[in-house]
Amino acid sequence: MKRHLVAVDIGGSKTAFLARTVGSDRKASVERYKTPASGGVGAMLALLDEHIDGLAGGRSSLAALGVAVPGHVDPNGHVVCAGNLEGWVDVPLREQLEERYRVPVFVEGDANCGALGEKWLGAAKEMNDFVFLALGTGVGAGVFVNGSLHRGAHSAAGEVGDMTFPRRKRNGAAPTLASIVGKRALKKVVRRETGKKLTAAEALHRAAKDRRLERLTREFIEYLSTSVVAISSLLDPEAILFGGGTSKAGEALLKRVRETVAPNHVVRARLMLAGLGSEAQLYGALWGAQNALASSQALDAVEQLPQAAP
């Protein structure tokens, strides 16, 4: 029976699944489902069950699982918090999944997964210092320094969505980067002002030829560009890779960010689209599942070695 590696990218609005046969390097198809709006972790586990049970060979064919979570995850796969998911606070997710499926499990923050995916199969294969900027329902960054994923002292490196801008207070509170650059925020502004139901990526793409949309997306570009300058001045990366659903705006997005940051000479990094596009996080989770399986097999091999004589 063929055994499968399953990767899951949990987003604030959509959850993507990818299954690949162990040992294969063939590109697998991606399936997307609506992320449960309520029910917390239990609702997501039910969605996982449904997908995994639908594999050829069913649950018994699952070899390892990799999961990208939109939030703060510690090195042990414990979800500290995931702000865009109801009830996801202090969740021992890796432990729960290992008990549920009895296979090796990898759990990581989605931005970190994006960086891992790009380093493995994407635009950063030859880079040692780069930042993957995940633009979706929220905003996060996966950081590579000297060829390794940088987590920080509290495993919270890259939580750029929490950056605040005190000089632009709204209703007495300083807005965060995520509150402006998150795709729901831009979608809401566009719909309120134009009546059009456009995704953030669509609005940014059309803004190149639509003055009204250009004006409505200007604040988005300004805030995003400010974060690019901050990241560049702090880390001096070789490149900043734009991924996540909003990156589907493509060169229309990059062109405006480049033009906005151009006067600031601290930005030496190349501003690029992620090589794997909006699937970078999914492939990072797949890398994690593959690595978890290999580590488990190596441990099993060691445990099966004959014991040395006393």
Role assignments for model-derived ranges:
Residues A156-V160:
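Structural signature of FAD isoalloxazine-binding scaffolds in flavoprotein oxidoreductases
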Residues V105-G109:
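General beta-strand structural signal in soluble alpha/beta enzymes
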Residues S13-K14, A111, T137-G140:
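Conserved A3 ("GATE") glycine/threonine-rich loop of ANL adenylate-forming enzymes
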Residues V79-V89:
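A charged helix-plus-loop insertion that forms the helical arch/lid used to bind
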Residues M1-A64, D74-N76, E95-V103, G117-M127, ...:
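ATP-binding/phosphotransfer module of carbohydrate and carboxylate kinases, centering on a glycine-rich
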Residues G152-A153:
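A short alpha->loop->secondary-structure connector
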Residues D9, G66-P70, F132-G138, G142-F144:
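Short beta-strand segments
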